[in-house]
């Protein structure tokens, strides 16, 4: 089975803590699936506004790399030699997400765990019993998990007014008079009898 070298996933910020009654269940299922397919994983909850964008949008980014990649091999070797220290440095400085979105500090509390310590027969058992608390950043290498809360190196957000164009509006943004009937029909209410390929009729609205 051919697998991609790199996987980038994006989801809502609450993914790491969902669902409320089984905190972390959904995210731990994702980690388990990627681990079983031979991937190392790093994740971060990122607010676009913290890095200068004119939008307050928090999203969870999951970056996975397969065990055939150079970055996987380098991290695996570092973890073997330095243990948690290298995992912490990966989250804070060396990771793909840390390089793209720098952080300035971290919480004192952290989570260390092994995904293999969670014993279950299959994914359905995880869905019923899994409950784990993880922070807004972390890394998993060969089933070993390290997670910590990080504070971003904030860049002053760009006000929306600075992004709006104030000059003349190009003509191609306006509807032409001759196109109005087609737009009126497309956007307006309708109830038309149409025919399927098998000859039966249906009402299109």
Provide a role label for each language-model segment.
Residues 1-204:
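Class I S-adenosyl-L-methionine
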């Amino acid at each position: 089975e051919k697998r991609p070298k790199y996987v980038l996933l994006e989801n809502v910020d609450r993914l790491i803590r969902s669902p409320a009654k089984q905190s972390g269940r959904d995210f731990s299922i994702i980690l388990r699936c990627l681990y079983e397919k031979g991937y190392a994983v790093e994740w971060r909850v990122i607010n676009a506004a913290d890095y200068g964008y004119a939008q307050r949008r928090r999203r969870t980014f999951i970056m996975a790399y397969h065990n055939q990649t150079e970055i996987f091999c380098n991290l695996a070797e570092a973890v073997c030699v330095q243990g948690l220290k290298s995992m912490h440095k990966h989250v804070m400085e060396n990771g793909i997400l840390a390089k793209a979105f720098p952080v300035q500090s971290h919480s004192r509390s952290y989570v260390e765990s092994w995904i293999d310590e969670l014993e279950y027969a299959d994914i359905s058992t995880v869905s019923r019993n899994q409950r784990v608390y993880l922070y807004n950043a972390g890394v998993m290498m060969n089933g070993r998990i390290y997670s910590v809360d990080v504070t971003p190196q904030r860049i002053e957000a760009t006000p929306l007014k600075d992004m709006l164009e104030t000059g003349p509006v190009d003509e191609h943004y306006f509807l032409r008079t001759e196109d109005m009937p087609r737009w009126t029909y497309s956007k307006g209410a309708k109830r038309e009898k149409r025919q399927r390929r098998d000859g039966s009729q249906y009402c299109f609205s």
